Amino acid sequence: NFLSDSKEANRKLAAKSVGKVLGDNIKIFSSITNTLAKDKSINDDWRKLPNPVSARNLSNVVEDSIVDSLVNSVVDSYPKLSHRYFTLKAKWFNKKHLMYWDRNAPLPFQSSKTFTWKEARDIVIEAYSEFNSDIGIIIKKFFDEKWIHSPVLDGKSPGAFAASTVSSVHPFILVNFQGKARDVATLAHELGHGVHQYLAGKNQTHFNASTPLTLAETASVFGEMLTF
């Protein structure tokens, strides 16, 4: 990801390249965006949903008011958190203001240590095992049974996913491992989903094994916290 490259020239080139493609196709992308927005509006009207976010909140089994409170709290914290952080980051880069392509730049003092797949595996298994040995056994099973696909390949979707199938079949983990500390944390995150899905499949039926996003992310973020 050149937008996270340590060299500013590479980050700038990547940002300008993305911007150029978007600019060259602005009418197409505008048409797509407007079409999707109108389709969403029509569906919401048919279903008598009060807000654009209501459909998503309904699927996540959470009230609009709860999400609104969360969003407002985050926005209220901008000055003392994100604004302060980016001001500090600009100073660390000896700049008055950060450019767009500096947002995801690694910090000057950030460790460049990389991890092998085996090292990442051992770190994650140990982290979960120290919390609970039974969960550690399940995590190890994901590696031993090859339920994880980790290489970066042409045509493979970016990002990371825990893909459940049916309750009688184990889930699969899809990551793009490149050896960074963030990749180890991502592996731990997705395995949190994986353990959750594995245990749900063992103890629930096909119709109630799935969970809303609000609950699912609790397990995955907890896995990250165990690891780092």
Model-found features: residue ranges?
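Cation-handling catalytic/transport regions enriched in His/Asp/Glu
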Residues: 1-228
